Amino acid sequence: ELKGRVIAVTGSVGKTGTKEALRLVLSRQGKTHAPVASYNNHWGVPLTLCRTPSDVAYGVYEIGMNSPGEIVPLARMVRPQVAIVTTIQPVHLAAFASLEGIAEEKAGVYWELEKGGTAIVNADIPQSELLRDIAKSGPAGRIITFGESPDADVKLISCALKPDMSVV
């Protein structure tokens, strides 16, 4: 069993970039483990969990999906204290009737938070309120929103994308 903080990242896009940013930042705070690639499916998540040293301070796990019913079982394996949904995009519409259906599936990660955990929600997407409502109805003790929206708890003030780095 992991003694460190466990973070789950899901979303239609941005999972790997978010995972890598978290790995970079958290590794300066303590021993951090994250998958070396996009191991975010029913094979990759258990493999990553098995490869995680028990003494890490932080474990960062990507959770992906292709069809309904995939997020909750993977999140249940991970048992995060922090869960992030990066964004919702029309990349899974072949398997879902709407963007709201995709959002509901992705929000399944919030249902598997440890009691009192933190749900992190993108404030800049149309499904933000739906994601917040789902997070409120689960075990989350805290919900943090992020983005450029004036209502976001954590606001992006400026961003410069350069060939070898991003400055925020």
Name every feature range the model reports, one short phrase each.
Residues 1-123, 129-140:
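Phosphate-binding loop of NTP-binding sites
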Residues 100-103, 140-168:
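Adenine nucleotide phosphate-binding catalytic loops in nucleotide-utilizing enzymes
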Residues 124-125, 167:
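Heptad-repeat coiled-coil segments of the DHp/HisKA dimerization-phosphoacceptor module
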